[in-house]
Amino acid sequence: MRRPVAVLSAFVVALVLVAISMTNVGAARSPLSTPAVMAFPAGDDWEPAVDSDGAGNVYYLATHFGGVPSCASCADPTITVQVSHDGGRTFDAPRPLTVGPSTQYDPQVKINAAGIVFVSYLLAKDTVVQRSDDLGASWSDPVAVNADVKQGPTDKDGLAVLGDDVYVGFDVAQKFFVSASHDGGRTFTTTQINQNTLGWPLNGGATVAPDGTVYMVWELIHKSGQAQGPQDVLVTKSTDRGASWSLSYADTGLPPGPACPTSCGWDFLGTGAAIATDQAGNVYVTYNAPLYDHGPPHAWYRSSTDGGASWSSRIDLSTDGTPSFHVFPGVAAGPAGDVRVAWMDNRTGAYNVWYRSSADGGSTWSADIQVSAFRSGYAYVTRQGFAFPYGDYITLALDPSGTVQLAWGEGPDYNGPGNTLYSHG
């Protein structure tokens, strides 16, 4: 979701200029497809989500600003959906999930083993879920997951699905919650995670292990007024289908991130986290954070083989060795030890999306692989990359066939207009 615009620092502009002076580090050839511009090629699209059932059906969501063509009743912004039935080679035209006056943000999409598609997003003050039982041809009406905790506007939803069990995390100011459904998203019961103030929470993602254990990752920002203080990466865990939750810190006391080189939302380049579990139940977390206050962020990786009771030493995912900004990391996992990661950085003087894989749970990794690519017709894209990340996150998924699904946003700056892109392989 777009956050209020923040005041910028000249110090960060200097850091960006340092990054621009660095040369590119050689990268391996990408195993993923040439990136495709999704939603509306003219923009303005932001914060995409993607998932695939592994049987050729791919679902791509984006937040569209500026009004949906031929939909006078659509909100601004509106969540749009595109569906592919040929494994992501072609997609139908974007269409709104919900037609109405209420603004929509932060789409998430997950698919269960039966091929039922679930989406969550912010609809006005609520966090809602819809489902499709016919490969995206039609969608149920939105169901507010927070109906039993009407305490204020919700933010930053995270979605996880296993069978008929649907879990949605969200926050209301300094409180954070998980709503659980055990009837396929038709009704929800909500549990408040924190009874005491732990910081300003933002959900980074959610996952369900094969044994039904649910994990969510949260970024906790400690602040006074608009000043950003230390930030934590918190993992919450439920072994009783969302009725109760335990807490495990993957990292704590992280320095606040840098300001932006142009106007941005609050804490836009601060800690952002993602989470995944493999088929053996191992847990993987990625997050970005600098080594010192307002310094250039690194993309970090940690894993747990004991359900979050302990965490491995953190690994710096990028091998470029430059003082560039590494932000918006994502993580996905499949069979035991099969881990995929992606992030954005500006090692070339512009931003690109980078990808790595590991077959042994992160003990060893492939080379850095550049996924994003030059395309003509967009002033903010050069041979070095794109000008700035567009949206608060990227989405990385690994479908049951072992195919990577990757979605991200690119733009001239935080305010856009920008575009969302898709690659798979």
Q: Where does each model-flagged region fall?
A:
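N-terminal export and membrane-targeting signals
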Residues: 1-11
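Bacterial N-terminal signal peptides
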Residues: 9-20
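Intrinsically disordered, low-complexity boundary segments flanking structured domains
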Residues: 20-26
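Extracellular, repeat-based ectodomains that mediate carbohydrate processing or recognition
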Residues: 26-425
